[in-house]
C-alpha cells in the first residue's frame, strides 16, 4: 500500500501518568463529582477501558459503562443537558455528533487514540481518492473528519455483518484504520478489503509465544480476544469479539479460567458478570519490560477523578468538545447508516 503517512513507523508520545491520590483525596473528588453532576444537569458515560474506580463512579451516579458508540447513544437518549465523557477524544466527538444540542465535557482533550492518530485526514483522504471504486468503511475509533470522509462507520460488534452485506452487493472496501480488525473481517467474509495500516497500541502488543506459554500453564482456560489483536493471537482464541461480546462470551463459556486479550479495564465489568471465574491478562512484552502500554491504554488512564472534577467545574476550552457544523453533518451520515443497519440486525 502506498501512502504518504506510515502508521507502523509512527511513535506516539505517551502522556504522563496521573499523580496517585490517597484515600482522602479520592473520597473528596468522588463527592465533588457527584455534587457537580447534579448541579450541571450532567450524566457520566465511561468506556470499558477506563480505570475501575471511574467505571464504579459512573454506575453509582446513574451513568453508563459501554463501548464508544453505546456511550454516545446513551447520552443522546438521556435527559441530561451535559454529558461527561470519560474516554478518549474521538468518543467525545461522536457524542457531540449525535447530540449537538448538548454540552459535551471531557476530563481532558489530550486523551488520544493511536488508531485516530494513525489515520490523519489529509493522507487518508488522498488514499481514498486514489481508490475511487471502493466503498470507504471506517472504524468508530477515528476523528470526526475521517468519519465525514467515509461512506460507513462501523463498530467491531457488527463489522463482519456489515462487510458481508457490502460484499453481497458487489462492493470493494477500503477499511480504516485498524489493520488487524480489517484483516480479521476480510478472513471472515472473503470480501475484497484494502486495509489502512493503523493499529491499537494496546492490542498490537499481545505476544503469541508468551500466550502459548500462559496457555500451557492454564490448559483449562479459555482465551478471549478482541479482533484488534494480531492474527496469531486471534488464531488461538476460543472467543473473538468486541468488548460487549467478550463480556457475553465470559458468561457463556464453560471454562472457569479466562485469559483475556484486550485492555485490562474490561475486567471491572467482566468480573461483575462472572464473579465466580478467574480472569488473567493476556501477556504483552511486560515481562521483558519492553511493552509501551502493557495492556492498558495510557490515554484512558488520563481519566482520573481529579481530571473529571476539573472538567465539570471548569468546562471551557480545556474540556468542552466542539465539532464544526459542516463536519458534523458529514460524519452523521455514515453514523446513521450504521445505526440503521444495526437496527436491522436486531429486528
Curated annotation (Swiss-Prot):
Pathway: Cofactor biosynthesis; NAD(+) biosynthesis; quinolinate from iminoaspartate: step 1/1. GO terms for molecular function: 4 iron, 4 sulfur cluster binding; metal ion binding; quinolinate synthetase A activity. GO terms for cellular component: cytosol. Iminosuccinate binds at residues 47, 68, 139-141, 156, 226-228, 243. It catalyses: iminosuccinate + dihydroxyacetone phosphate = quinolinate + phosphate + 2 H2O + H(+). [4Fe-4S] cluster binds at residues 113, 200, 297. The keyword Cytoplasm applies. It is found in: Cytoplasm. One of its GO terms (biological process) is 'de novo' NAD biosynthetic process from L-aspartate. Gene3D superfamilies: NadA-like. Its cofactor is [4Fe-4S] cluster. The keyword Manganese does not apply. Pfam families: NadA. It is an enzyme of class 2 (transferase). Keywords: 4Fe-4S, Cytoplasm, Iron, Iron-sulfur, Metal-binding, Pyridine nucleotide biosynthesis, Transferase. Its main location: cytoplasm. Its EC number is 2.5.1.72. Belongs to the quinolinate synthase family. Type 1 subfamily. Catalyzes the condensation of iminoaspartate with dihydroxyacetone phosphate to form quinolinate. NCBIfam families: nadA, PRK09375.1-1, PRK09375.1-2. This is Quinolinate synthase. The lineage of its organism: Bacteria, Pseudomonadati, Pseudomonadota, Gammaproteobacteria, Enterobacterales.
Amino acid at each position: 500500500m502506498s501512502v504518504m503517512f506510515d502508521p507502523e513507523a509512527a511513535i506516539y508520545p505517551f502522556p504522563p501518568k496521573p499523580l496517585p491520590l490517597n484515600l482522602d483525596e479520592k473520597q473528596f473528588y468522588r463527592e465533588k463529582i457527584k455534587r457537580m453532576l447534579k448541579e450541571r444537569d450532567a450524566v457520566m458515560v465511561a468506556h470499558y477501558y477506563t480505570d475501575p474506580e471511574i467505571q464504579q463512579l459512573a454506575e453509582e451516579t446513574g451513568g453508563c459503562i459501554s463501548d464508544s458508540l453505546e456511550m454516545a447513544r446513551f447520552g443522546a437518549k438521556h435527559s441530561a443537558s451535559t454529558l461527561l465523557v470519560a474516554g478518549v477524544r474521538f468518543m467525545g466527538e461522536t457524542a457531540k455528533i449525535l447530540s449537538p444540542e448538548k454540552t459535551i465535557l471531557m476530563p481532558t482533550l489530550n486523551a488520544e487514540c493511536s488508531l485516530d492518530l494513525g489515520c490523519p485526514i489529509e493522507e487518508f483522504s488522498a488514499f481514498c481518492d486514489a481508490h475511487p471504486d471502493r466503498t470507504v468503511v471506517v472504524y468508530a475509533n477515528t476523528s470526526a473528519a475521517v468519519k465525514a470522509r467515509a461512506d460507513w462507520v462501523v463498530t467491531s460488534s457488527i463489522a463482519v455483518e456489515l462487510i458481508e452485506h457490502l460484499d453481497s452487493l458487489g462492493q470493494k472496501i477500503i477499511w480504516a484504520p485498524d489493520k488487524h480488525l480489517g484483516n480479521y473481517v476480510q478472513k471472515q467474509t472473503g470480501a475484497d478489503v484494502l486495509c489502512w495500516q493503523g493499529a491499537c497500541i494496546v492490542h498490537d502488543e499481545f505476544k503469541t509465544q508468551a500466550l502459548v506459554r500462559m496457555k500451557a500453564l492454564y490448559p483449562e482456560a479459555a482465551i478471549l480476544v478482541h479482533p484488534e489483536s494480531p492474527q496469531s493471537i486471534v488464531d488461538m482464541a476460543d472467543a473473538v469479539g468486541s468488548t460487549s461480546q467478550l463480556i457475553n462470551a465470559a458468561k457463556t463459556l464453560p471454562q472457569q479460567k479466562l485469559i483475556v486479550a484486550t485492555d485490562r479495564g474490561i475486567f471491572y465489568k467482566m468480573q461483575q458478570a462472572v464473579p465466580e471465574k478467574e480472569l488473567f491478562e493476556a501477556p504483552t512484552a511486560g515481562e521483558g519490560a519492553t511493552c509501551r502500554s502493557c495492556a492498558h491504554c495510557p490515554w484512558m488512564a488520563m481519566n482520573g477523578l481529579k481530571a473529571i472534577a476539573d472538567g465539570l467545574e471548569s468546562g471551557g476550552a480545556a474540556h468542552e468538545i466542539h465539532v464544526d457544523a459542516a463536519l458534523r453533518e458529514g460524519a452523521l451520515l455514515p453514523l446513521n447508516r450504521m445505526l440503521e443497519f444495526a437496527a436491522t440486525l436486531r429486528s
